[in-house]
Regions:
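Amphipathic, small/basic residue-rich leader segments at the start of a protein or domain
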Residues: 1-124, 144, 148, 368, ...
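Alpha-helix capping/hinge segments and adjacent helical runs
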Residues: 2-5, 89, 188, 258, ...
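Glycine-rich cofactor-pocket loops
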Residues: 29-32, 62-75, 284-299, 313-350, ...
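Internal maturation/activation junctions in enzymes
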Residues: 78, 129-130, 141-178, 182-185, ...
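A structural-propensity feature for long, helix-poor, extended segments
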Residues: 131-133, 142-145, 437-439, 447-492
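A short core secondary-structure module
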Residues: 186, 190-244
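A glycine-rich, basic-preceded beta-loop-alpha segment at the flavin cofactor/substrate interface
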Residues: 195-197, 234-250, 255, 262-296, ...
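C-terminal amphipathic alpha-helical interaction region
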Residues: 454, 470-592
Length: 592
């Protein structure tokens, strides 16, 4: 295991060249978030996560969580760590100043999120779910709910959860059976939820559950589901902690990964009914919940990149130290990092991680604009970008995080298969990312359906025009940039061909949705890496000698050659449609 180092130079370069931070921080609400301020905050965040949180990763995974006499006990490695996060203000940097937050742009918060996610994926889920609760309450909570709950959740003193899933209601939430019975100014909630991340714990002083339930007499299906706020402890009128509510953890899952995150089965109302408060309109719970879900989906994409960065750093350090075999032109006993195939694997890890990071920051930058830009048209465009990019960030980034983590094990060789190195933990932890907060199959259907077919490809066409604009700006005579321009032109052509094929054959969309999402994800990440490479080339032309800039060009070139080339196969899969799937019946998949 190696020491994690925050890629601060990466963050700074992306803020400059992808986000355009000098203009970004001039938007209303960000007046106190100048570049000078951010340049002071991010190094402090880096120091905290490197020194305090990152060392907990392996130990907390080994310790896991336990349910003892009805009480969830988290890993001893976390003792005092979460409180230090609260004290440092690191739980939610973009929380509203009206409710005790720092009010920083989302692009700064996502940098902090990545630091936490690289440091400890399991712990990162605690503030991640709280952010979703904050988002939902900001949009749909009453003034009383906001005043009672937001400040404590934003600061991390209280945490939040999302309670959707039941044994019979996973992706299909129309089957939710948890009941809500009116009782004066509140409701009594009864039922059971499963797979609730950080559903109960002792690190925060209160746990605020957002719960999907059906009010007595409500319509069947999705149109009869409402959203309720159910606190673990009922706040007193002065905001202090009051009596315990009728909600408790009755089980903890034993999982493949993220062992230090308590994944709970939650029982509501075993002793008469848990007091809950309606959030948003009756029977519109899914609408309210999906505002929280979309926030979580972006966060899972960021989480994949954070884990990928940690896995890459560990694999690169191991390869630089591990001496094995001979390399032409070097003395016997060369570190394996000099072997071409090991270099390939490390570059693959690096390119996928850096591409995903650029995509994540681009999406969050658009989200900032959707809320804060002074121009209504820019706000509208930002909202459109977020809508289109959310399934890509969640789907593509979580898929490649598994690939990166697996390559990390491979670089370690046999030692990667041994738990004590820590490489295996990254692979175990990454496996959940394509599953939770909406499986990647669902993300693919969302992307191809709502983001392409529903508007006839209008939104995606606008995004492709942005890529066309980049192509026009690539005027450098550098051979590397010339090659990148040619490759980007071909990539945009492939995207338009895939979109035209889907629009002409909408019935094939479910069968090709995954290939379609991955094709666009590859293309968009390559585009943003080219933007960074072109900026790096300009710095080199101006006399910069830092190898960081030549590395940006090398990374984009590798992505274009070794990863973007996958799009030829993905495009062919889109062209083939459902033909190969139609050759076999579903029943044949389970018959001998």
């Amino acid at each position: 295991m190696t020491v994690y180092k925050v890629p601060q130079k990466e963050f700074a370069f992306i803020l400059d060249e992808i986000v355009g931070y000098e203009e970004h921080c001039k938007m209303p609400g960000f007046e106190d978030a100048s570049r000078d301020v951010i340049d002071a905050i991010l190094p402090e965040a880096a120091k905290f996560f490197e020194d305090v949180v990152a060392p907990t990763n392996y130990l907390a995974d080994s310790q896991g969580t336990q349910l003892i006499d009805g009480v969830v006990q988290t890993a001893a490695a976390f003792d005092g760590v979460y409180q230090q996060m609260i004290d440092g203000g690191w739980c939610c940097l973009n929380g509203s100043t009206e409710y005790g937050g720092a009010g920083l742009p989302g692009v700064i918060d996502v940098a902090s999120q990545e630091m936490l996610q690289s440091s400890n994926s399991a712990l990162s889920l605690l503030p991640m779910l709280s952010r979703g609760v904050i988002h939902a309450l900001n949009l749909y909570g009453s003034d009383e709910q906001k005043n009672t709950y937001l400040e404590n959740i934003i600061t991390g003193v209280w945490s939040g959860t999302m309670n959707l899933t039941e044994p019979q209601a996973g992706t299909d939430l129309s089957a939710v059976q948890t009941k809500a019975t009116p009782d004066g100014d509140h409701f009594l909630i009864s039922g059971q939820k499963i797979y609730i991340t950080w559903g109960d714990h002792e690190l925060a002083k209160n746990v605020i559950h957002l719960v999907l339930a059906r009010i007595s007499g409500a319509p069947e299906g999705n149109n009869g589901i409402s959203l309720f706020l159910v606190p673990k402890y009922l706040p007193n009128t002065d905001g202090s902690i009051g009596r315990a509510n009728d909600v408790r953890a009755v089980g903890i899952e034993h999982k493949l990964g993220i062992h230090a995150s308590p994944t709970c089965t939650m029982a509501f109302g075993d002793n008469g009914g848990a007091i809950g408060y309606l959030v948003g309109p009756e029977n519109r719970g899914l609408m309210c919940m999906f505002s929280m879900m979309n926030n979580a989906r972006l966060a899972v994409g960021h989480q994949g990149i954070g884990l990928g960065e940690r896995a890459y750093q560990q694999a690169a350090a191991f390869a630089a130290d591990r001496v094995q075999g001979r390399v032409a032109g070097m003395p016997q006993g060369a570190p394996i990092i000099h072997h071409p195939d090991v270099k390939r694997m490390l570059m693959q890890m690096r390119a996928l991680t850096e591409g995903g990071r650029a995509l994540s920051f681009y999406a969050v930058g658009a989200e900032d604009r959707s809320h804060h830009h002074s121009d209504a048209q820019q706000r509208e465009r930002g909202a459109l970008w977020v809508e289109m990019l959310t399934p890509l960030v969640k789907g593509w980034c979580s898929e490649v995080s598994m690939e990166v983590a697996s390559l990390g094990v491979q670089v370690h060789g046999g030692m990667g298969f041994v738990e004590e190195t820590g490489a295996a933990q990254h692979m175990r932890d990454a496996r959940i990312f394509p599953i939770y907060e909406g499986t990647n199959g669902i993300q693919s259907l969302d992307f191809i359906g709502r983001k392409c077919l529903r508007d006839g490809g209008e939104g995606l066409s606008l995004l492709l025009l942005e890529m066309d604009t980049t192509i026009l700006t690539l005027t450098s005579k550098s051979p590397a940039i010339v090659r990148l321009r040619t490759t980007l032109e071909r990539s945009v052509t492939d995207c338009r061909a895939a979109m035209a094929q889907v629009l002409a054959n909408p019935d094939d969309a479910p069968a090709v949705a995954y290939s379609y999402l991955m094709l666009f994800g590859n293309a968009l990440c390559f585009w943003l890496l080219v933007v960074l490479a072109a900026a790096a080339q300009r710095r080199i032309d101006e006399g910069a000698t830092d190898r960081f800039y030549s590395q940006k060009i090398a990374t984009a070139s590798f992505f274009g050659s070794q990863i973007l080339s996958r799009n030829q196969g993905l495009l062919q899969a889109v062209y083939d449609g459902s033909a190969s799937l139609d050759l076999i019946d579903a029943g044949d998949l389970v018959s001998a």
